[in-house]
Curated annotation (Swiss-Prot):
Gene name, Swiss-Prot/TrEMBL: astE
Catalytic machinery residues: E222
Name of the protein in question: Succinylglutamate desuccinylase
Function: Transforms N(2)-succinylglutamate into succinate and glutamate.
Entry's family note: Belongs to the AspA/AstE family. Succinylglutamate desuccinylase subfamily.
Alphabetized UniProt keyword annotations: Arginine metabolism, Hydrolase, Metal-binding, Zinc
Pathway terms, separated by semicolons: Amino-acid degradation; L-arginine degradation via AST pathway; L-glutamate and succinate from L-arginine: step 5/5
Length: 342
């Protein structure tokens, strides 16, 4: 067994090492079976596989410069391999944009997290397009072998944000046309996530793909700020790390924590041309509230004006390519959302 693969999956991946066929799978502590499937893709399965057990995909590095969750995943692999973290279900570990990770950048040509659900087919020349297709295939194959039972398929996609936030750690749930899951909200509470953004239209993120195409309970976690490898204070991510490990150990639900607040997307600001202006401070924090009638953006004849008594701006980015989202507008819907969980 190539010890370095499991002891430091991050370093192994950054080095671009590809194991020989005879060294691409094996058994580690507790009889856990592992298989290296692709660059940055590792499957781990318990020795005893029970009917109905969870299949959990945990991904990080879909943006190559979001290093803290990548480091957390490397430590998780090491701890499972050494038997200090329990695994009672199937686990697929994915480090997303490995080339961008090696270059210490967010992406090379295009944002990988906007290329899923087949959108990569529209950008065949993009460096990220083949990786998006490969990650779709990896998720599809993984979940195809999982029971199609409620709560049996999970996808946790971990990120860090470019900017500060009124809620330092928050989650985004994809739109599937179905009611949102109480089990997911309870797990997010255990992860110490303080706010959840609820999408109202289908998107092209990895969690949207796994929710829609694979039937997974999927979420995107935003866990803090972007920092270089080795400069993260991982204690700040202890809540999410602990909750992921509990999920993999089959212990979810044993810790009761406050439910996160819910915010529903009601509109988006789109950059339509090079004349686009986002009329907020460059360092405005995610979830900053704005009062009714505030003009937040303009682009030729286009204006975005706040319509509700209060709307909050999330993911403002004035430098995206024309045609892409320059910000999401949300309103708080906590009481209504929590009353409708299933």
């Amino acid at each position: 067994m190539p010890v370095s693969l499991l002891d430091d999956f991050l370093a192994y991946t950054l080095a671009g090492t590809r194991p020989a066929a005879s060294e691409a799978q094996g058994t580690c502590a507790g009889g856990v079976r592992w298989s290296w499937l692709d660059d940055g893709v590792l499957l781990m399965e318990p020795a005893v596989q029970e009917e109905g057990m969870r299949s959990v995909l945990v991904s990080a590095g879909v943006h190559g410069d979001e290093t803290a969750p990548i480091e957390l995943l490397a430590f998780l692999v090491r701890d499972i391999a050494h038997g200090t973290a329990a695994l009672t279900g199937r686990l697929l570990v994915i480090l997303g944009n490995v080339d961008a990770m090696r270059d210490a950048c967010r992406y090379r040509d295009d944002d990988l997290n906007r290329l899923f659900s087949g959108r990569h087919l529209q950008l065949p020349q993009s460096h990220e397009a083949p990786r998006a297709a490969a990650l779709e295939r990896a998720a599809t194959r993984f979940f195809a072998a999982a029971p199609d039972n409620p709560g049996a398929r999970w996808h946790i996609d971990m990120h860090t944000a470019i900017r500060a936030s009124a809620f330092e750690q928050f989650a985004l749930l994809p739109h599937t046309g179905k009611p949102f899951s109480r089990a997911m909200f309870e797990w997010l509470g255990e992860a110490r996530i303080s706010a959840v953004l609820l999408h109202t239209t289908r998107g092209n993120t990895y969690s949207h793909f796994t929710a829609q195409a694979c039937g997974a309970l999927a979420c995107t976690l935003e866990l803090g700020k972007v920092r270089p490898f080795g400069q993260n204070d991982l204690t700040r991510f202890a809540g999410a790390d602990h909750a992921v490990r509990h999920l993999l150990a089959g212990m979810r639900g044993e810790v009761r924590a406050p439910m996160p607040r819910a915010f529903t997307v009601i509109d988006q600001i789109t950059r339509q041309s090079e004349a686009f202006e986002l009329l907020v401070a460059p360092d405005v924090a995610n979830f900053t509230p704005f009062a009714k009638d505030t003009v937040l953006a303009r682009d030729g004849d286009y204006r975005y004006v706040v319509r509700h008594d209060e709307e909050r701006l999330v993911f403002p980015n004035a430098t995206v390519k024309p045609g892409l989202r320059a910000g999401l507008m949300v309103i708080e819907t906590t009481q209504d959302t929590l009353s409708k969980l299933v």
